[in-house]
Curated annotation (Swiss-Prot):
Localization per record: Secreted
Provenance organism: Schizosaccharomyces pombe (strain 972 / ATCC 24843) (Fission yeast)
Family listed: Belongs to the lysophospholipase family.
Chief location: secreted
Glycosylation sites: 118, 153, 187, 232, 256, 264, 293, 331, 360, 367, 400, 403, 474, 508, 513, 537, 564, 586, 603
CDD domains cross-referenced by the UniProt entry: cPLA2_Fungal_PLB
Domain PLA2c: 67-607
Function: Catalyzes the release of fatty acids from lysophospholipids.
Protein's name in the database: Probable lysophospholipase 5
Amino acid sequence: MKLSSFGLFLALQLLPALGLPSRIDEVDVSDPELIGLLKPDNVDKPANSIPLSKRSTSPSYAPYTVACPSGSLLRPASDGLSTGEQEFVDKRVSKVNSALESFISKTGLKIDTKSVLNDTDGPRLGIAISGGGFPAMLTGAGAINAFDARNGNTTSLGGILQSSMYLTGLSGGSWLVGSVAVNNFANITFLHDDVWNLDHSLFAPYDDAFENFYIYQEWFEQVLQKKNAGFNVSITDLWGRALALKLVNPLTGGANTTFSSVTNETWFQDGEFPFPIIIADNVIEGETVIPLNDTVFEFTPIEFGTWDTGVESFIPMEYTGTHLINGIPLNESCVRNFDNAGFLMGTSSNVFSGILPATNASLTASNNTFNNAVLSFLEMLAEDQLDVGLYPNPYQGYGNASNTTTTNPLEPYPIIELIDGGSDSEGIPFWPLLHPQRDVDVIFAIDGGYQSATSGWPDGSSLVSTYERVLATNSSGVRGFPYIPDTNTFLALGLNTHPTFFGCDGRNTTAGNHTVNDDTPPLVVYFPNYPWTMYANVTTYTVQLEDTLSSGMIENAAVAATQNNSDSFAVCVACALVQRSLERKNMSTPSQCASCFNQYCWNGTIASTTVTTYAPTVLSAKI
């Protein structure tokens, strides 16, 4: 990752401005001389510039304390779904079944829908949006737009969004999930046109240089509010403030918009759209490479925590930020407002922890003053734990209630350090959808990740990583996963050039050859980014996209997801949706589906030839 000189300068100012350890002289960001240094030549302050005094009245970013409920705040994972999530699922089941019936009827798939959809044992779909910055967000947005029945009959897959129970995201995918969740699940066109403002840089959101300076000063002040309230802060807080202006609220910046407040949104209370989940990876102090078996944390509007062995517990999202000892608050006070939506999305997409390992060699090789300064800055971030999201540990002193033989890896630490949800190479957030408590039958995996070895196009590596994690952990705590080939096979067989189904036969998965039941691993439908209407292989670190580019990427993803609005492919999608339900109920697979599976399911072949180059060309005209 390359830091712009402007971005580096502002990052360098953040640390002394917050009073944090630094090798840089103290700098007062409000000093008139500093403002003079930043003032562009021959540019006067515009009359309509927003005064700093008005910006200072923005809602507080600082967490605050409230009285705690009695008893332990931690819920063991062995309890199953939280009460709040279960209530949401119960409200949504009938809506999902109704949407599925409409979609299946529209496709013309000949099955007895009443038998398949007549109870809570009907198909349960989860949609997973990959990481990869704004390009991944836009790829996911294109797929979601194609899946949205609110767009009428303009796409062949309209209704899939309404048929889904869960929506997960990590890194750039978390930006999409978080943005739709806090904006009352507005449609993609509205978000693109009226919220995201991607034609302005993430690091320079306004046309006027003074406005950009003032917004940075506002962000500094907001993060200082949090620090002065007694909480650890890091560069992730500033990152989250920048993201929130793009993704949460372009007018106020969402300084006090929390993820738990999603429960107050009309769509959530009515169960109208899928349950949102954002994930981040835990990093233990001293780790420079994140292992594949790291602890994966979930953020939902209901709670924060993990199903993973050793911790296996959750705290209510509204009280995230409360430091607990053995599940009990230290001073009988609970923290509120810590779960800032921008901060959570910033945590899930925190790439700063990857900067030092990725750039150390190249910076060291070029022995010049600027590179040495950058390297020194990055080392400082790592040494002082300022390159991670810092969360007061609710698990300190907590013995795992469901498995006392397993050590809680977070037990000694007062602070949990969280980083980009794809840091363990699992670039698609499958993990929350594999836990048996959620009963997910099929996962639609939207892959907009940038892979440098394949000219920026997906190569299936994210599926491979999750498959390897499941094998390495012996499926501990999860239902298993379909068999996945190596990335060379993806390229050689073209599995990354179109939607590909994995696990079509529920008896042939990592769970073994067993009768298909509620514990059978889900079928995975893989939707890779591909150049149907344009070259959408934009680098992860792109922070500004012209409207024509961003809208074009959304359109390209929609065309790729629908296979250019193919009615025959829509039938095959319907087959994937109902397959596990048919298998569980011992119902025969329709002949239409047999033909679909022959075309789209990976048949187990492993490529023997090595692919050395991969550079696809634009495929078709627009819809």
